[in-house]
């Protein structure tokens, strides 16, 4: 249970509270939407207590809850009101994607409205959910949740359209790419929020969020790749012909670089992380104390030489995933975001592995976000892109991704894209649906005057 907190005035309806829970840090933002722009009123970044998360997955829930609570309290101090509704994003760990097209015949003379478009998109997501649920998979247990979707194309009478609203025709369609994560990944995020006393009102995927800031729609005509290099995972999104064509995830990121530094220079993980950050900041000499209590001073070139093999391997893995998602072709350019993208030599290594000129692999910082106004202090580097993206995504697609059903007084959270049956909800509530099926009594078999007789069991009663 969250600890008793100071009473504050209610959270305004137009306020957007965002948490980006990363492997190493928790970033929080509070902002509002003003027309097509977003104003950031407060920002806070804190590191986890120890390694509470590994490779984007929550391991120590209590430590993550503590970090979330601290970030929330700092933000509440800045804005002066309670923050009890939040937007979050999940890293693409064990990511699955599904591409689905839905078409509907139209009534003659009927104008397409937002309700029809939304219904077709939801139908496509439901079809994707069923395909994921029914796909044969080895060594996988549990349901996959849809954590985000993007419209690839709209169609009217077989022709590609950028928008359907207001048009008339004989047939309309939509093609959607939906992204799914295992129940464990999603539920751990919701458990943290519940214990911190915060309601989740928007859930998206980190690369979807980052894409909405780093690659605006007018740039998606180009074949571009976005890579969100965090501490535990590198999430990938590909754009082409005005739409998003693929999502993927590489299970390697900045922590591999940190671990290489720790092993080579005999330091703990936190010290290795500091060495990596000082190297990224451009320091020529770095001082630290190793595990033998020796005071050590090294040149930045020595650190670069140490991490080069790891950076090359990281770049090779990312490059392979990009090429696979892009049909074996090199994209026109690659944008890197996330704190891990600042690893020395990473952008050049990715350029070399993909065959792109080095100037076509760029690290994007906050300056790319033209429609965001910052009030006060906030990190300006590539690590700021994902939390800003969550805020922008919330403004674009307000609404909840889950609804709630009460079963025998117990509230059960159900994902909105899944055609749930009563039995499914009962199962989520921990109730075995088989208990609803009445079982008949056992039959009685006996002999009477040497003849075998059988009496059927009685009809079962609830």
Predicted region positions:
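Acidic, glycine-rich loop-and-beta core segments that form the ion-binding/anion-interacting portion
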Residues: 215-280
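Generic beta-strand/beta-sheet core signal
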Residues: 31, 89-91, 206, 229, ...
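Short, structured interface segments
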Residues: 382-398
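Active-site nucleophile and cofactor-binding loops and adjacent substrate-binding regions
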Residues: 201-206, 250-251, 380-382
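Nucleotide/phosphate-binding catalytic cleft detector across ATP-hydrolyzing
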Residues: 1-25, 29-224, 243-245, 269, ...
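A general structural motif
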Residues: 311-319
């Amino acid at each position: 249970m969250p600890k008793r907190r100071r009473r504050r005035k209610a959270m305004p309806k137009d306020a957007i509270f965002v948490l980006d829970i990363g492997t190493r840090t928790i970033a929080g933002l509070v902002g509002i939407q003003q027309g097509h722009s977003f104003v950031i009123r407060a920002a806070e970044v804190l590191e986890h207590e120890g390694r509470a998360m590994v490779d984007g997955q929550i391991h120590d829930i209590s430590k993550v809850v503590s970090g979330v609570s601290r970030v929330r309290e700092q933000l509440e101090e800045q804005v002066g009101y309670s923050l009890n509704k939040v937007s979050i994003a999940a890293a693409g760990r064990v990511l699955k994607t599904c591409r689905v097209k839905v078409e509907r015949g139209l009534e003659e003379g009927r104008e397409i409205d937002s309700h029809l478009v939304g219904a077709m998109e939801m139908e496509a997501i439901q079809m994707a959910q069923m395909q994921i649920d029914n796909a044969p998979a080895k060594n996988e247990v549990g349901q996959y949740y849809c954590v985000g979707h993007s419209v690839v194309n709209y169609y009217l009478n077989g022709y590609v359209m950028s928008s359907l609203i207001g048009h008339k025709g004989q047939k309309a369609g939509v093609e959607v790419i939906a992204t799914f994560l295992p129940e464990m990944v999603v539920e751990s995020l919701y458990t943290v929020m519940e214990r911190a006393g915060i309601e989740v009102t928007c859930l998206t995927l980190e690369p979807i969020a980052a894409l909405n800031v780093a690659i605006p729609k007018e740039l998606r005509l180009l074949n571009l790749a976005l890579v969100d290099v965090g501490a535990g995972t590198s999430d990938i999104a590909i754009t082409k012909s005005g739409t998003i064509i693929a999502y993927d995830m590489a299970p390697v990121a900045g922590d591999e670089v940190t671990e290489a530094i720790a092993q080579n220079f005999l330091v703990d993980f936190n010290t290795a992380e500091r060495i990596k950050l000082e190297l990224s900041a451009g320091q020529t000499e770095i001082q630290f104390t190793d595990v033998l209590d020796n005071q050590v001073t090294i040149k930045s070139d020595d650190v670069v030489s140490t991490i080069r093999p790891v950076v090359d391997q990281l770049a090779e893995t990312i490059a392979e995933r990009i090429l696979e998602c892009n049909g074996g072709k090199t994209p026109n350019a690659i944008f890197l975001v996330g704190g891990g993208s600042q690893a020395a030599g990473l952008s050049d290594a990715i350029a070399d592995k993909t065959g792109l000129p080095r100037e076509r692999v760029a690290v994007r910082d906050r300056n790319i976000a033209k429609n965001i106004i910052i009030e006060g202090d906030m990190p300006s580097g590539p690590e700021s892109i994902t939390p800003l993206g969550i805020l922008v995504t919330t403004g674009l697609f307000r609404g909840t991704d889950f609804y709630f059903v009460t079963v025998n007084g117990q509230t059960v959270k159900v994902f909105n894209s899944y055609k749930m049956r009563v039995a499914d909800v009962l199962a989520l509530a921990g109730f075995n649906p088989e208990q609803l099926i009445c079982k008949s009594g056992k039959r009685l078999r006996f002999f009477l005057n040497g003849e075998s007789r059988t009496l059927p069991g009685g009809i079962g009663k609830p």
